[in-house]
Amino acid sequence: MTAWTMGARGLDKRGSFFKLIDTIASEIGELKQEMVRTDVNLENGLEPAETHSMVRHKDGGYSEEEDVKTCARDSGYDSLSNRLSILDRLLHTHPIWLQLSLSEEEAAEVLQAQPPGIFLVHKSTKMQKKVLSLRLPCEFGAPLKEFAIKESTYTFSLEGSGISFADLFRLIAFYCISRDVLPFTLKLPYAISTAKSEAQLEELAQMGLNFWSSPADSKPPNLPPPHRPLSSDGVCPASLRQLCLINGVHSIKTRTPSELECSQTNGALCFINPLFLKVHSQDLSGGLKRPSTRTPNANGTERTRSPPPRPPPPAINSLHTSPRLARTETQTSMPETVNHNKHGNVALPGTKPTPIPPPRLKKQASFLEAEGGAKTLSGGRPGAGPELELGTAGSPGGAPPEAAPGDCTRAPPPSSESRPPCHGGRQRLSDMSISTSSSDSLEFDRSMPLFGYEADTNSSLEDYEGESDQETMAPPIKSKKKRSSSFVLPKLVKSQLQKVSGVFSSFMTPEKRMVRRIAELSRDKCTYFGCLVQDYVSFLQENKECHVSSTDMLQTIRQFMTQVKNYLSQSSELDPPIESLIPEDQIDVVLEKAMHKCILKPLKGHVEAMLKDFHMADGSWKQLKENLQLVRQRNPQELGVFAPTPDFVDVEKIKVKFMTMQKMYSPEKKVMLLLRVCKLIYTVMENNSGRMYGADDFLPVLTYVIAQCDMLELDTEIEYMMELLDPSLLHGEGGYYLTSAYGALSLIKNFQEEQAARLLSSETRDTLRQWHKRRTTNRTIPSVDDFQNYLRVAFQEVNSGCTGKTLLVRPYITTEDVCQICAEKFKVGDPEEYSLFLFVDETWQQLAEDTYPQKIKAELHSRPQPHIFHFVYKRIKNDPYGIIFQNGEEDLTTS
């Protein structure tokens, strides 16, 4: 019995899950085939005088009716006829419409000369956030209107909208086909919407801001402006509703995408299943096809039609669902479109060549070469079932993939003449992953050119599990050996595994995708960033004598990480810019994690060896080893311990955590494990005594535990964290317990028999002060990273006195939002009578609604002379001075 037969029988017995995947994949593939049939006149560039639609009767038949509605065509419909999706056009031309450095006046000057519906995304200096500037028709009065873009944790949305998206591109693409809170849908510039290939889009993108004043920004002679919906409830006029009623029964009617702006809450939504992101091509060798039925035409002839699309399967919930979006939502599949010839008969779509897949990375090419023997499984079996047909859906025509480019060879984009015919017109709006569900808003296409790579099918499960801390990154120029195996998985099994791994990949957050993208960029020596990182890593590994001490080496690495992070935040090598994918208050966090993976991961082994050599050379480890043995022989009371200590089992648990810490390269993750150890020690102390303990009691217990673990490597681990941890994390619990661990080790190093290990020596205290000053005073400019996300606010009432609460306040939350939080926390009945005040230097200053309390707090902390200040929530009429603080950059001491 062959291996393939055994695998197939195994799937029959245990593969009900795979069978379900096959069924859903087949239905979605057929759905997409039906959805992408465009009008012949549209493909020829002609504007139809009237629109035909297929109306389903209650007896199951279809008839053709004229649609008298004339709505303005949205950008999505134009993109279908031009073989490129809206998302593709937005991604390739973002240097044109994404102008974050543009001021309000410059944006208004650009849009004044544009037709209604054209837009720009820039950053407003007044609102301190990104805005969508939209050109309005004359009947609206004002020529422009700005819509603020709200940035939450890794999502983007318009102010007032309940729909969130993973990045700006999907947000703009959605509003090109649905208006939601906008007065009408967005429109792409004429040159962008009519471009036929990616090469043309890239040529336009090279103009950047000059595109708006160039001849390329040409408009058609009679471009109709976008219209508002004719009714507020989002339903088309009564004449159109009558077409949907046959014998008093509602019928299912297919609609063109241009009608989507007339159907808001009751209209068709775009559906995407993250399991399947590619349109399944038809089997040219006579595979299974959906049975077609014949319906009598109006003139008595029969015409072939496909059955109506089946309802889509339920959407997969995201792992990180926004609370306001975690509600039940109904998703309707996009209606199918049918081609008509001039005689009114339905024209069957012609078979078009299947597109050749783009060049893949080397590791993918080797993986696909190994599949060569299994590619002809379905081709050699005329009666192959649907499973085998799905197995070859991803490999069009059995054509081999193109050769992968070299390390520094960039394949030029194919021209429109040499590009093979693709299914650009067949790419439905659902391919943009647009939906009102949070799972779709957080989902990225794996084949999307956003990050310039395709996910490796061999390591999809590893990508889902996140970053691997227990291995060091391989050198960037290391050939991957092909694994030889006596058993080759059949194409069927590989296809199923790829689909399942695609689900795991779709669950990755934008943060992890960006970190992985930056890590790939750091290994690309064709980029300046890649050369910078690789040259520095090679220099450190080859020149071990360039540092005089362990502290000097770690400080140099930290300084390089900070400089590279600053370069990357301003560089154009991240295309598209990181601001369009990650909210501003999370950019530094994402870049810091990327630096850990790009720099610290390949240097982990080298840094560990160098730290060990330094401490062995200066004799500190020898002294530490002797003192550890001496401390272990003492009773806890002799060490100044008067609280319960962990038993042998708890000490072993702590030792396992310390050993796990050694395998990690990220200082942030090391600190998280250290916090778990400290929490475990505190739990043992409190549970065994029934009372709370402070820091004076905790330090001797921590010293005792470290001595019992007997690990010399803890010395280098703590030094590693203290020098490489991001300074913004030194102000919280991580920095506090990190200094506690350093103090415990200092007590062991300086342990004397006649002295209890309870108090730190003056030398250790001075060392900690110098370390804290060195790590924190270099950040002179106040930043959103210099403070915690908490704000202490006092509530003052005439009768009840003053009380206070600690509120969770993000850096970009305004005073108006803080007042709303205070009104809820303090249970104020008339919040309009209250406001937030700043009390500093014996003066009261009422904060304006558009100021940022956390930025004010950071600026006060960064001053050379410390100021005592308080945020007070109190009645406005009790303000004796009536001083309004308008700007966070003004002098806080002037009244």
UniProtKB/Swiss-Prot annotation:
Query: Per the database record, which ranges form the Ras-associating domain?
Result: 787-878
Pfam families assigned to the protein according to its UniProt record, in alphabetical order: RA, RIN1, VPS9
Residue ranges under compositional bias (Polar residues)? 328-338
Q: What Gene Ontology cellular component terms go with this record?
A: cytosol; endocytic vesicle
Q: Pro residues: which segments have biased composition?
A: 306-315
Q: What is its main location?
A: cytoplasm
Which stretches does UniProt call biased (Low complexity)? Answer: 430-441
Q: Where in the cell is it found?
A: Cytoplasm
> Which residues, renumbered to this chain, carry the PTM Phosphoserine?
S366, S501
Record keyword Glycoprotein present: no
Which biological processes are named by the entry's GO terms? endocytosis; positive regulation of endothelial cell migration; positive regulation of endothelial cell-matrix adhesion via fibronectin; positive regulation of vasculogenesis; small GTPase-mediated signal transduction
Q: In what residue span(s) does the SH2 domain sit? A: 97-190
Checking SMART domains in the record gives:
RA (SM00314), VPS9 (SM00167)
Q: Where is the VPS9 domain?
A: 618-757
Q: Which keywords label this protein?
A: Cytoplasm, Endocytosis, GTPase activation, Phosphoprotein, SH2 domain
Q: Where is this region: Disordered?
A: 284-361, 373-442, 460-481
Query: Could you tell me which cysteines form disulfide bridges?
Result: none
Tissues expressing the protein:
Widely expressed. Expressed in heart, kidney, lung placenta. Expressed at low level in skeletal muscle, spleen and peripheral blood.
Q: Kindly indicate where the leader peptide sits in this chain.
A: none
Q: What does the UniProt function comment say about this protein?
A: Ras effector protein. May function as an upstream activator and/or downstream effector for RAB5B in endocytic pathway. May function as a guanine nucleotide exchange (GEF) of RAB5B, required for activating the RAB5 proteins by exchanging bound GDP for free GTP.
Protein family:
Belongs to the RIN (Ras interaction/interference) family.
Q: Give the quaternary structure.
A: Homotetramer; probably composed of anti-parallel linkage of two parallel dimers. Interacts with Ras. Interacts with RAB5B, with a much higher affinity for GTP-bound activated RAB5B. Does not interact with other members of the Rab family.
Which disorder is recorded? Answer: MACS syndrome: A complex disorder of elastic tissue characterized by sagging skin and occasionally by life-threatening visceral complications.
Q: What is the protein name for this chain?
A: Ras and Rab interactor 2
**Taxonomic lineage per UniProt?**
Eukaryota, Metazoa, Chordata, Craniata, Vertebrata
